[in-house]
Amino acid sequence: MKIKHWDRWLASLKDDDYLKNIEAIKLYLAVMSIYEPDLLDEYMIDDDFHPMISRLKNVTLDVTSARFKELYITESKMNYARDELDGAMIISKTLTKSDIVGNVALPKAQVMSVLTRMNGVTDEGLDNGFEVQVHDIMEDDLYTVTLKRIDDMKYYFGTGWSTMKHSLDLVEGDVQKLYWDQFENKFIVLNFQHKTMGIMIPV
C-alpha cells in the first residue's frame, strides 16, 4: 500500500476492521517512523488521523516475528528499490573463478569511495580485518563478512564470504552488487531492480 494513501485507508476503517488490522497499523507506523518520519509527523497532527492514534496508544499487542518480517522487509525493499542510490556507495564485481573458489577481490576505487562513509574504520582495522554486515533484504538474511586490506591497497572479503556466496548461490560470471547504507551501517545486496542516478538498473 502506498504511504500517501494510508491515511485515507486508516480513516475509513470501521471498528471491526480496525481490530482486524491492528497489527498492520502498528507495524506500519513503526516502519514509517524509520523511513518517512516527516510524513508521519504530518499524520500525527491531522484531525482525521489523530483519533486513531489515540486509540492505538491504548492497545497492547504481541506482534509475531513473522508478521513483522512480512511488513518490515516489504517496506525495506520498496525503499531501496524506489529511492535513487548513490553510485559512489556501490561496489560492483563480476565474480571470477578465484572469487568463487577463495576470497573475493574487490575493486579498489569503489571500496575506497565507500570507506569515506564508513564509521569506525581505521588503517589498523583494515589490515587486521574489519567486520561488516551484508543484508539480503529479499530473503531477510544477514551476513557478517570481514573486509581486509593487503599489500597496502588491495581489498577483499575474507571470513564470512564463503557462507555468503553459497547462501546466495553465486557462481562465476555473476555480478555481485552491494550498496553501503551509511545510516544503517551495512551493505545491501542489490539483487532487485533499483535506480542509480536516475537510471533503472535491472536485476
Curated annotation (Swiss-Prot):
Main localization of the protein described in the UniProt heading: nucleus
Superkingdom, natural source: Eukaryota
DNA-binding residues (ranges): 99-195
CDD domains, alphabetized: B3_DNA
InterPro entries (UniProt xref): B3_DNA-bd, B3_domain, DNA-bd_pseudobarrel_sf
GO molecular function: DNA binding
CC per GO annotation: nucleus
Protein localization: Nucleus
Keyword tags: DNA-binding, Nucleus, Transcription, Transcription regulation
PANTHER family: TF-B3 DOMAIN-CONTAINING PROTEIN, TRANSCRIPTION FACTOR B3-DOMAIN FAMILY-RELATED
Protein name, per record: Putative B3 domain-containing protein At1g50220
Annotated source species: Arabidopsis thaliana (Mouse-ear cress)
